[in-house]
Amino acid sequence: MTRLFIVYNPRSSRYLDVKQEVLSRAKELNGYLVGKYEVTDAHIDDNITKLSKLLEDGDVVLSAGGDATAIIAVNAILKSGKDVTLSVLPYGNFNDLARTLRTRNFDDVFLSDALVRNFYPLEIIVDGKFFRYSTCYVTIGMMAESVGLYNEPKMRRKLKKKFGRQISSYTQLASWYFKNRRNRIFLPEFKLNGVLQPKKSSDYAAVNGRSMARVMKGGEDYRDPQFFRHQVDRLANFYRLVVLMSRSILSRIPGTATDGDIIEFTNPSTVAIQAEGEGATFENVKTIEIRKGKKCLKVIEN
């Protein structure tokens, strides 16, 4: 009998939906031994380690939550080294991984003609040390720093409301942007793959999935074991932000294909890095490497 681990966060804004639409329905599944992993309020790395120790070959992990929950499941599977299949359902704010896999509800995973495919995630290395795997995108700089807004109590309360969650989140992001965009340097002077980047560059992005922050369109680089797309831009400039957003929503996020990026700062720097909404700030950073991971995921894709 196949073991199914449902990963969820009881403190998430849509936990009641998860309880009714996933946890309850899982009890009716035939052929599965259902277990649950409840994300704790400990550090994300602690959750990754705990979940990884539970996994065995042949397991299926179902992430029922937002991208933050999904990234715990992804990293736990890859850390375990076991032959585990991942499925993702969208119960968060942006749900970029679920959008990439096109799994919208319980039936898409268990009762449809969904396929198991290989998924090639991004790997983030900071000063030679592994940081995290990311499935859909990585940002460094201003956009990465802005995700800290979602951890503030005021924002968490607004995101628990049944209606207006998305509008509220975008409004708060816009307010943060205009308040902070000229306050400091988000990306100190750096070279990308040996090439000095333009002054006032505020953001680096690596894109691997179909979407980024819900509304920005990506591609299918996650199916490629070697290449993804990258972009460096001056998004503290409002005009350039509008141009980028317009192109990304109407067409596709602009970018250049790469088989790996090395970011080298002229001086040791403090920078924010985020992967699918989970961010961290690093001090005295000299180099950051983004590349396709040496391990691939098995995923259920609709």
Annotate each language-model stretch with its function.
Residues V7-N9, L89, V207:
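Short hydrophobic segments within beta-strands
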Residues R11, V138-M142, V207-S211:
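Glycine-rich beta-alpha junction loops
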Residues M1-A64, I71, N75-A76, T103, ...:
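ATP/NTP phosphate-donor binding region
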Residues A205-K217, G279:
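Glycine-rich phosphate/pyrophosphate-binding beta-alpha loops
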Residues G65-G66, T139:
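Helix N-cap/beta->alpha junction signal
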Residues M143-S146, K199-K200, S211-M216, F238-Y239:
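Short acidic/glycine-rich loop or secondary-structure boundary segments that cap or lie
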Residues L16, S80-D203:
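Catalytic core of DAGKc-family lipid kinases
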Residues L192, L196-P198, K217-N302:
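ATP/nucleoside-binding phosphotransfer catalytic cores, i.e., glycine-rich phosphate-binding loops
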